[in-house]
Amino acid sequence: MQDYVSQLLYAINNYNPDDSESVNVLRDLVCWVSDNEMLKNDKVIAELLYIASQKMRVFGYNILNNFTEEPIPSTGYLSNISGSSITNLYRSKVYSNNILDKSQQEVVDLFQNLTVRRLLVSAPTSYGKTFLMREIVFLNKDRYHNILLVFPTVALLLENARMMQKFVSDNALNYQIIKTVDVALDDETNYIFVFTPERALQLIAAFPDLRIDFFFFDEVYKIDEDYCSDGTEEDEDKSSSRNLRKSKAEVSTQEFLNEDRGKTFRIALYLLSKTVSEYYLAGPNLAQEHFGIGMLRFLSSNQITVKEINFEPTLRIAVNAYNTRIEEKMPKCLPDSKNTGLIPHGAKVNDRIKEVVSYIDNKKYGKTLLYCNSPRKAAEYSVKLAGKMDKEIYDSFPDNFKMFIQHIQREYDIDHSVDEWSFIQVLKKGFGIHHGKLPKYIQQEILEQFNKGTFDIMFCTSTIVEGVNTDAQNMIILNASKGGEKLTPFDIKNIKGRAGRYYHCFVGRVFYMGNIY
């Protein structure tokens, strides 16, 4: 067995927060060892994992490992240290049992200490950007009477409205949560509006005299039509030439809708930035040197401070699954992977999907998302996979989910053909489907059941990789496009980021069914 004690000791002693290589080595070791129950049951290794988390100030590792704040009892090999003095510095002001990571605390402190409290935070997926928003709101609860939170989708709006309702209730705050513009407002009441950009514009139009003290704008990259994820002039020239060659008739509906929504995002942010003094903007994987001219001008003219965080707390393993072998690409500090699987030569895509899903199941790697470029593809792939699987796990479903399926059968029983509807058949086989063409309440129920563990495979489109949170450990990228457009490096980063959510798992695996770069 590999000498993880020596490796951890060496990585801890050579850890330098300003050296990305030493940071990544210690992260990879901590995540890899923590993901192995047998390894971390060793008392020396457990103590080293605790010390590594404390030294990195990435406290989510200890929380996920169920390590207490007090040091693990000394084994005699290592000096005993007290962790409480460290963790108390990073304790959440909202929930005292939560500990902020060092970089998270830096974001909160930076906002609080700014002369002009306007901040753009770029951080990896699942970093906790909305969690930090709640910290900021709590610290300023006596100053902020009306708060506006803007999220890009209705699914995110509903998820965050529930979180904010709990936040207000748990802390006995004097706020009323509002999700729709069709309400009567009272000057004596404090409000937290949780809206999409479209609803934010409706609010501004309906209540022009309403004073908003603070706003939060999520997925802010959507407002920059010039944003280029790889930042090369050559790619910008290619993109411009491609668009010029297209006639109006050739521009897809999806492209038109994306452009239209982009304008809505920009107008909403522009109007809010002109009337609100303090705000916090957030987005994933944004690199300032790749911002378009419009975004740079917006940041400068509004005196917005930019905070970039590049550290990924989860070990993410790339897995090639597009040849005849499934091969995991391991970091140098970890042993070469013996976890390989074979795919029959010339296997068609649906057979290949079955092999990869079976590989994940046999390795007990956990829950899996399968990214598809359209609802049609999600339906096609899921039906094919369901047809290749012998099991039907409907009888093992919890009663509330059985009732949900029965409700769908009653509600959508058109010409008594609902039993033939592929969606029902796929659900009964234990696979979820999530895309924007499904009614919102169905999307929400499917997502909740996936997170509860009712089923562990879900076919999805871009609707679930643009901010909706799951606890999936694996992502299989089936298509290299989104709608009719090729995935950009920025899109790929966001999709990859859905495998291995921080605070839920240590290791995420991304399976590539084709060479997407």
Regions found by a protein language model. Give the residues of each.
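N-terminal helicase ATP-binding lobe
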Residues: M1-Y517
